[in-house]
Amino acid sequence: MVLNIWFNRWFSTVSHYMDMIRNNPDQQAFVIYGTHPNPDTVYFKKCDVSFIEPDSKGEEYLQFCLDFCRQHNIDIFVPRKENVLISQNLASFEAMGVKVLVCPDGELMALMDNKAAMYKSIEEHNETGHPIVTIPTYRVINNAEAFKDAYQELTSEGSRLCIKPVVGEGASGFRIIDDKADSISFLFNTATSPKISFATAYKILQKQVHFPDLMILEYLDGYEYSIDCLAGADGTLHIAIPRKKGKGRIREIEYNEELLVIAHRMADQYKIPFVFNIQVKYKDGVAKLLEINPRMSGGLHISCLASVNIPYYAIKLLLGGAIEVPRPTYGVKATYIEQPVILSKGSVLTKA
């Protein structure tokens, strides 16, 4: 049976996941659908069928998703955009027979989407005597004076600080507070940088009486790891693969017992199904949580060099299939290069 699978507004690296799903060990056939507002989206090259989707959000976008699934007889939907809202309306998709690769617990999805709420939840659990992972020192602020107070409090403890939105994805809004960012030498000798001085940040934040919740927290200066996880429908963890981010584009698949324990504790507590990603970073030898992403991560294809086809196994588990849990190949060091991709010359895609 050929299955129609749809990816909506993903990262460009979803191209790799499409390849892995298509080239699966069970020889399961798929027709891959892809949508994005940008007609030059690179992953359209990997799709059998592609459409330009509307640049909408919220309930309007949810309705688009439901209509698209109905019109194209979608069997499997792998959402990125509006995945929290989609999770909260899963019954509407299931009523059409559509399997959705998303955590079915809408409240848990909303919790993970809010970094401050997730931090608080983990802190409360840590206090029970069964710690999951260390949380960085942080404060949540929504006005300039609160930012100033939090900055003075945390710097008095000797911490370098950074800021990031409570609700956001990737590195959007992330800044390292460094007063050297206002110097002439920094201007002349530094390319694109996430650094911003306290004075500049404070001046910007003063432009509004209130702004969306922002976290100010200790900057973690050690190695960063992404732990890509595969779990069953009930949240039972099958595989966890720690991926170390080295200098530049160097990545290492590392057997790290401490991080594997964190992955198991997270899975035991929150029961996140199918596929998720835990990001941690070290400071003074302690791994501290950055965030949890209840979806395939942008760098999952690197983790799959451990000889585990996580995207396909996640789909198979979603469909109720059983998997033979493979043993990851640790010790892989990898990098990646830019590769030119010729887009279809003069092609015009149909709007969905």
Outline where the language-model segments fall.
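Residues that mark the start of a beta-strand
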Residues: V2-W6, R160, M215
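Short, charged, surface-exposed secondary-structure boundary motifs
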Residues: Y43-K45, Y61-Q63, L108-A116, A171, ...
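Phosphate-binding site of ATP-dependent enzymes
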Residues: L187-M266, Y270, K281-Y282, V286-K288
